[in-house]
């Protein structure tokens, strides 16, 4: 579908009351805005992703090293930021545009899919949930009860026909709190779909809660060392006269990491996912296998919290390559290097590892369930 996903993260975060602006605050294992970016990428139906940021937050955005998305500066208000984003993609001739607030990191891919499907027959589609609370309107010193069945809490992402929305933005006479309001004021039809109660908005600092389910998994792998084979450890090619024997590239570190993550997520093991009886995986790089597992775990709502890795080998010594391995794994898993710890161990020349005939690795992974 010819579509663009816009993420608004250009606010001042005044109500959030923190030295770190809200979009860059750690939430469920990574900066808040990365949740929306990663979900948009995994959804894999957007031709372009646009991130709108506050010009005062350049140092924060630079540290994230975000790639393959367009980053632009927002305006003084949410409406201005949305308009800036729409203008920035005018030449792309997108049919549809999804606009989302970075402050809502908990939307699901299922909700995105519903929005895109409804957009085939509508120009404006928004998710909403009915309030379960009693709602009153204050009038002077009195209050008036409002009918709950008529009260909706509006959420993002919101989906639009790009051309229709851009026309309304160009002709607006006053500011609006969200883009759907432009359709309301113009008397245009709006399609409301059922939102998600978990798709809450992070507004103040106390909204950041780690009330998530943390799960753990253990991974272990060992490979024989033989002549005339390449040696890969943690995705890094290690200079060595001998290498690991395996159906794939024989990387014991990435295999153990993969199994630990699968175990933590209750998703089986690496042998079930990538059978050594399947010729398709013959000599395949383990970086590709781990990348696929990361995509699968993200779709199920799991985020990696921490990896603790023991690489057990007499030779080579791991210290020299530790930083390379750490950065490689962090990149594949889409986490910060600070969430990974790597330790090199020997067996004091005991057993097959001590005799330099094998290399082993054990990993403990912790993950957070993003419900």
Curated annotation (Swiss-Prot):
The catalytic activity of this protein is classed by the Enzyme Commission as 2.7.7.60, 4.6.1.12
Give a yes or no for keyword Isomerase in this entry: no
Q: Where is coiled-coil annotated?
A: none
Note down the stretches annotated as region 2-C-methyl-D-erythritol 2,4-cyclodiphosphate synthase.
215-371
Domain of life, per UniProt, equals Bacteria
Molecular functions per Gene Ontology: 2-C-methyl-D-erythritol 2,4-cyclodiphosphate synthase activity; 2-C-methyl-D-erythritol 4-phosphate cytidylyltransferase activity; metal ion binding
Q: Which keywords does the record carry?
A: Isoprene biosynthesis, Lyase, Metal-binding, Multifunctional enzyme, Nucleotidyltransferase, Transferase
PROSITE patterns attached to this UniProt entry: ISPD, ISPF
Q: Which NCBIfam families match?
A: ispD, ispF
| Family designation | In the N-terminal section; belongs to the IspD/TarI cytidylyltransferase family. IspD subfamily. In the C-terminal section; belongs to the IspF family.
Q: What is this protein called?
A: Bifunctional enzyme IspD/IspF
Q: What is the lineage of its organism?
A: Bacteria, Pseudomonadati, Pseudomonadota, Alphaproteobacteria, Candidatus Pelagibacterales
